Amino acid sequence: EVRDDVPPGAGKFRGGSGVVKSQRYLTPGFMTHESDRHLDPPWGIFGGKEGAGGKMEIHNIHSGKTRSEYSKFSGMRAEVGDVVSYYSPSGGGYGEPLDRDPAKVLDDVLDGFFGPAHAESDYGVVLKPVDDGYDWALDEEATKILRTKMRA
């Protein structure tokens, strides 16, 4: 599934969303895992912001306990009911976020890549709720004013 716990890196061209892959152990076993960018998130370039780092979590559905693990390990014991979830990093942005077309930022919010607060803080795009708060519309005048302030 698409990773929705963190936004992708902001930029004129935003970074890609990470993904979440999970598997549940039905019997005891051992696992090996290798990934990168847990401590050093993907960089943004030419004014783009960095993406989010990856992470690895193991949640046991019987005990209710969740623990985080390092990005690389081998021969780790897995118990019955362990759900191993790998969150891949999200990509860094390319170019200045304030140069992204506000209509594209609105599309990103409507498509669930990030929320209106992120649109405002990172892209300088002000959205207003419509249809009882279940939809959003671009506030062009407020966006123009905010972006001017953010560029100063």
Question: Whereabouts are the PLM-identified features?
Answer:
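Long, charge-dense accessory insertions within large macromolecular proteins
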Residues: 1-62
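Short, charged beta-turn/beta-strand-edge "cap" motif at the junction between a beta-strand
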Residues: 3, 89-94
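Active-site-proximal structural scaffolding
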Residues: 14-16, 49, 77, 87, ...
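Extended hydrophobic-aromatic, low-complexity segments
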Residues: 32-35, 66-70, 93-98, 116-118
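A short, polar/proline- and glycine-enriched secondary-structure boundary/capping micro-motif
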Residues: 42-47, 96-97, 127-128
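Generic long, charged, amphipathic alpha-helical segments
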Residues: 51-89
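Intrinsic disorder at enzyme termini
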Residues: 98-152
